[in-house]
A protein has these predicted regions:
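Helix-to-loop junctions at the C-terminal end of transmembrane segments
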Residues: 1-13, 223-235, 320-321
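Extracytoplasmic gate region of multi-pass secondary transporters
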Residues: 166-224
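Hydrophobic core of transmembrane alpha-helices in multi-pass small-molecule transporters
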Residues: 28, 39-56, 182, 262-276
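C-terminal ends and interior cores of transmembrane alpha-helices
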Residues: 23-36, 246-258
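Cytoplasmic helix-loop-helix junction between adjacent transmembrane helices
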Residues: 46-82, 290
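C-terminal transmembrane helical hairpin of 12-TM major facilitator-type secondary transporters
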Residues: 188, 204, 208, 213-284
Length: 381
């Protein structure tokens, strides 16, 4: 559903997409209370996968900040992506509290109503496709200053040129980035889902492993937030490359983690890498291909990322069953991360579209100047 949702996002904005995703996911979570057959469980998770916030539905939360901000895009993504880690820090222990007090079946229902109760009203009240829809400008720029400078002046400074999805798929960077993120995801998932049981099999205290897991989520938030704050001073490619290397080093540390401290710091570094990469994926597509058709472009890429990455966990599990060791799968994951890093490094910014470029500064002057309204107030909602 990624390409479909991406096009809807560019055309209509995130409001109803996010509301629909929240309601459908919430109803599926309630349905989990009543499942008793395997086909019911598979069906519910398939539906959640089609619209869920960790899949195509996540476009509705990652694309809008890139449309509302250009100069301050990194900072906006820093704040928005940090919310993912904050949610993990809050809801993982809260879920355990619900399970201990009400059983896991009732916990699904409680979490469903909490999610819908937060997401639906906030989406209806505050989400708008892009600032021009409200007569505003990205980054809170003043309309009068832009109009006084004239279109030519805008074309020479502060310009962001946007590619269409059809133009983007003809470029080399589109596919090297797609390959880099897909292979990285494959490498990550050979490790991420198996490291917890592996650490416990090595005799590490489960309570200490859970502590390190929680700290992993904290470090992911720190990584995404720090990357967003630094991206105006450090090129995005360097920040992104550091994420690949952090994940590879953390994976090597995990292979040798037979004591608490090495396990703890491997989880911390892994979290930093995950958070930095999470920011990088949200930022780099807008930097390379502009904001106008970002939903459509990322909608094409996301199913590929999810499909290839999804092979990692079952493949690693199969290797463990065959060999009795996690090491072969994990070393393969490290190699995949390094290959992905090379692909990312060779993915250069494609520059301007060659055929019929869509030229867009941070300021869509035609839509604002012809609106017949004085929008000197400027700003971001």
């Amino acid at each position: 559903t990624g390409p479909f949702i991406g096009r809807l996002l560019d055309r209509y904005g995130p409001k109803w997409i996010l509301v629909s995703a929240a309601v459908i996911t919430g109803l599926c979570m309630i349905g989990l209370k009543y499942t008793s057959l395997s086909w019911q469980l598979i069906t519910i998770f398939a539906v959640m996968g089609l619209v869920g916030m960790s899949g195509p539905g996540s476009l509705a939360t990652s694309v809008p900040p890139t449309k509302w901000f250009v100069k301050n895009r990194g900072k906006a993504l820093a704040y928005s992506s940090a919310g993912i880690s904050a949610g993990a820090v809050v809801f993982v222990p809260l879920t355990q509290v619900f399970i201990d007090k009400y059983t896991w079946q009732e916990s699904w229902v409680i979490l469903a109503f909490i999610g819908m109760g937060i997401i639906v009203p906030l989406s209806l009240l505050f989400l708008v496709r892009e600032p021009e829809d409200m007569g505003l400008l990205p980054d809170g720029e003043k309309t009068s200053k832009i109009l006084e400078s004239g279109k030519e002046g805008i074309h020479l400074s502060g310009i962001e040129k946007s590619w269409t999805a059809r133009e983007a798929i003809r470029t080399f960077p589109m596919w090297t980035l797609t390959a880099a993120f897909s292979i990285l995801s494959l490498g990550i998932l050979t490790l991420a889902l198996h490291r917890i049981p592996a650490f416990m099999d090595r005799g590490l205290d489960p309570s200490l492993v859970s502590l390190a897991t929680a700290f992993d989520a904290v470090c992911a938030g720190v990584g995404s937030f720090t990357a967003g704050m630094l991206v105006r001073k450090i090129p995005a490619k360097i920040i992104g490359s550091s994420a690949f290397l952090m994940l590879a080093v953390a994976s090597v540390m995990s292979i040798y983690a037979y004591d608490f401290w090495l396990m703890f710091w491997s989880m911390a570094l892994f979290g930093l890498g995950i958070g930095t990469n999470m920011f990088n994926q949200n930022y780099i597509w807008a930097e390379y291909f502009g904001r106008t058709n970002l939903g459509s472009i990322r909608g094409i890429v996301m199913p590929i990322n999810l499909f290839i990455g999804g092979l990692g966990a079952p493949a690693a599990g199969y290797v463990v069953d065959m060999t009795g060791s996690y090491d072969p799968a994990w070393w393969t994951g490290v190699a995949l991360m390094l290959v992905a890093a090379v692909l990312f490094v060779v993915s250069n910014n494609p520059g301007e579209p060659q055929a019929e470029p869509i030229v867009e500064s941070p300021y869509n002057v035609d839509r604002i100047s012809n609106s017949g309204t004085d929008y000197n107030q400027g700003g971001i909602v």
